[in-house]
Amino acid sequence: MKTDRLLINASPETCTKGDAEMDTMDTIDRMTSVKVLAEGKVLSNFEEPGLMRCGYHDAKNWVRRLSSETIVGEDTSNLYPFYVDTAYDVRRLRKDLINAKVDLQVENLIIICNINDISTVFLMREVVEWILRNFHSITVYVQDIFKKSTQFAVGDLCKDSNCSKNRVKYWSKEFVKKHDSFFDLMITLGGDGTVLFASSIFTKDVPPIVPFALGSLGFLTNFEFQNFKETLKHILTDEVRINLRMRLQCKLYRRNKPEIDAATGRKICYIDFISEHHVLNEVTIDRGPAPCLSLLELYGNDSLMTKVQGDGLIVATPTGSTAYSLSAGGSLISPSVNAIAVTPICPHTLSFRPIILPDSMELKVRVDMNSRGTSWVNFDGKDRVELKQGDYVVITASPYSVPTIESSASEFFESISKNLNWNDREEQKPFAHILSPKNQEKYRLDSSKNGNDTISNPLESSCISSDAQDEERKSVTETETEIVVERTRQAHFAI
């Protein structure tokens, strides 16, 4: 196991970072904080890809001139307008990126399926055969466990597709780690868990994902397998929108027991770097099998935010806001928003509400030295590790996002409406619908005499046209505006 040792002060209250970690954190901070500003500088040249790298360095220089690195004696009196313009351009550029369409040039395509269900092998075979028949320039990669699979039967598959066996190749986890930017497109067959697995094997660059839904409940799988031919034909021949789903970069550190320095007589301790993970949903720190509450310290940019006493803490991405965080009372967040959701698990206080933090913030969750028990951390529900007193996890926004092909511009709201019945409520009905036919006729006659506008059938009163509702809202809005203007005038004259 690869470890980086950090020499720190042994005080239980303050264990500061060593030089080795500070170098790493400076690199991460520069990537996360400068990246957005750098992209904003090239907005005017957005349609000229050759100028992108030049614009990055231009914006980076502006950030440095606005920071403490400003050269002594340089005139900085007019730098603030550039700062404001850059921030404005960032917002405009982000909007353009969300609405932009990408033309994918696919040569190497990887397919990942849920190997726990044998039926997915036959479904994958259908997809591979269709691609080989219709797109002769694409090489398909399937998992290496299907080399000798009788269900997949690569020899018969190539024979039926009338193509060479060289067009069907195999991938392994080791191959993906060495060639993470090799693939142009990824197809997943399964549920959300299959997408999470695909994200976990790509530690850096992830190819655009086409997630086909085969599970019972899915927030990430918005494409129906029944329409895979039409879907893939559109993606491989036309321009598509891509949603860059944020991931979290998690670094795990372990505090060793203090030692006595023979030269100075002072107590020192070492911090070992244990592992690094990139999660798409969440990182969870909980009390595990311990019978006592967990006691965690939550730091934001090296400042203590709060101490958490409860069953644990969830740090989630917007994609993970519909998973464990939602079950613990966290808010729903659109995946197009770059943010970090912090949700407590059964906190032993009434005032600890979930909070949403900017993605530029560096979080650190540390097991308090006075904690009665240990805690456990897991990353997207896997790789569970015990955290002892003084151990901590550093969490930042990962520079490597997970791109997924959008099925529609409103796919997020469609998924939460379909899977969670979000804001699904039966509309109010008029009381007249329970009247007998005889009394309904009397009701209509009585309403007509009083000059009320009625509908021939009271049951239809809840089905007023949308145009009429829009006119009514417009009238109410204009009336409210007039009242506000009149009150403003009165207040002005009163002054």
Curated annotation (Swiss-Prot):
Required cofactor names: Mg(2+); Mn(2+); Co(2+); Ca(2+)
This protein's UniProt keywords: ATP-binding, Calcium, Cobalt, Kinase, Magnesium, Manganese, NAD, NADP, Nucleotide-binding, Transferase
GO biological process, alphabetically ordered: NAD metabolic process; NADP biosynthetic process
Keyword NADP (UniProt): yes
Organism for this UniProt entry: Saccharomyces cerevisiae (strain ATCC 204508 / S288c) (Baker's yeast)
GO molecular function, one term: NADH kinase activity
Keyword Calcium annotated: yes
Record Pfam families: NAD_kinase (PF01513), NAD_kinase_C (PF20143)
Function recorded in the entry: ATP-NADH kinase with a low phosphorylation activity of both NADH and NAD(+) to produce NADP and NADPH by using ATP. UTR1 is responsible for essentially all of the NAD/NADH kinase activity resident in the cytoplasm, whereas POS5 is responsible for all mitochondrial NAD/NADH kinase activity and consequent mitochondrial genome maintenance. YEF1 can substitute for UTR1 when overexpressed.
Entries under SUPFAM superfamilies matching the protein: NAD kinase/diacylglycerol kinase-like
Other information: Present with 300 molecules/cell in log phase SD medium.
InterPro entries registered for this protein in UniProt: ATP-NAD_kinase_N, ATP-NAD_kinase_PpnK-typ_C, NAD/diacylglycerol_kinase_sf, NADK
Temperature characteristics of this protein: Optimum temperature is 45 degrees Celsius.
PANTHER family: NAD KINASE (PTHR20275:SF0)
Subunit comment: Homooctamer.
The protein's name in its UniProt record: ATP-NADH kinase YEF1
Domain of life of the organism encoding this protein: Eukaryota
Comp. bias regions, Polar residues: 448-467
Reaction equation(s) it catalyzes: NADH + ATP = ADP + NADPH + H(+)
Entry EC number(s): 2.7.1.86
Annotated family: Belongs to the NAD kinase family.
